A protein has these predicted regions:
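N-terminal [4Fe-4S]-dependent radical SAM core
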Residues: 1-30, 39, 43-49, 168, ...
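Conserved Radical SAM active-site core
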Residues: 7-14, 25, 43-125
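Residues at the C-termini of beta-strands that transition into short coil/loop
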Residues: 14, 136, 160
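Glycine-centered loop/turn positions within well-structured domains
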Residues: 36
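P-loop/Walker A phosphate-binding loop and immediately adjacent motor/lid segment at beta-alpha junctions
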Residues: 83-95, 102, 142-189
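Short secondary-structure boundary segments
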Residues: 105-106, 135-137
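Short, conserved loop/helix-junction motifs that constitute active-site signature segments
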Residues: 124-127, 150
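Receiver (REC) domain switch/active-site residues of two-component response regulators
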Residues: 130
Length: 189
């Protein structure tokens, strides 16, 4: 069965209450299909473009409507950029609901901007993203101390500021770390 723009190939159901895929309590949309095949990838089961299952976007939106106590939505996989039309539609929907949007991709921001010259859907998708975690996972650069990413080459890009300033602007991790420290301190007081 061939995929249409009204359905997305997902690796699994939406995963709520994630605390490792961006700040706050998040729901992860696990897309299926990835051509990067990074050595040491934590999700190799999501590489197969015919794996997972096709889900109508309407059903994914209904699942998003039922979410409770979530501060953000993270697109991961697989690589969401291999399903840009579907992910753009869902990101737009999530943004209207007030969610903070993070996207993990093996493409670099610069590659996505090049791809946007041939198909503007990539730029359209970027416009709904708050933070892009870009670049492939590189096993030789693995670093377990990094916030929300696995290897030194990957960046946390503040997409709205990057698009506005027309240069890469990194997400200010210190703001998150200070907020997190304050939350933990209040828990113990």
């Amino acid at each position: 069965m061939e995929q249409t723009k009204n359905e997305i190939r997902l690796a699994s159901d939406l995963q709520s209450d994630s605390i490792v895929d961006g700040p706050g309590l998040r729901t992860v949309i696990w897309t299926q299909g990835c051509g990067h095949k990074c050595k040491g990838c934590q999700n190799p089961q999501t590489w197969d473009f015919n794996g997972g299952g096709l889900v109508p976007l309407k059903l994914v939106k209904e699942a998003i409507d039922e979410l409770e106590c979530q501060t953000g939505i993270t697109f991961s996989g697989g690589d969401p950029m291999f399903q840009p039309y579907q992910c753009t539609e869902l990101a737009k929907y999530c943004k209207k609901k007030g969610y903070n949007i993070w996207v993990y991709t093996g493409f670099t921001y610069e590659q996505l901007m090049e791809m946007s010259k041939k198909d503007k859907i990539y730029l359209d998708f970027l416009k709904y993203i708050d933070v892009l975690v870009d670049g492939p996972f590189i096993l030789k650069e693995r670093n377990l101390s990094l916030l929300f990413r696995g290897s030194n080459n990957q960046r946390l890009i503040d997409v709205p500021k990057t698009l506005k300033e027309n240069k890469i602007v990194l997400f200010d991790e210190s703001i998150y770390l200070e907020e997190d420290k304050l939350k933990r301190k209040k828990t113990y007081i």
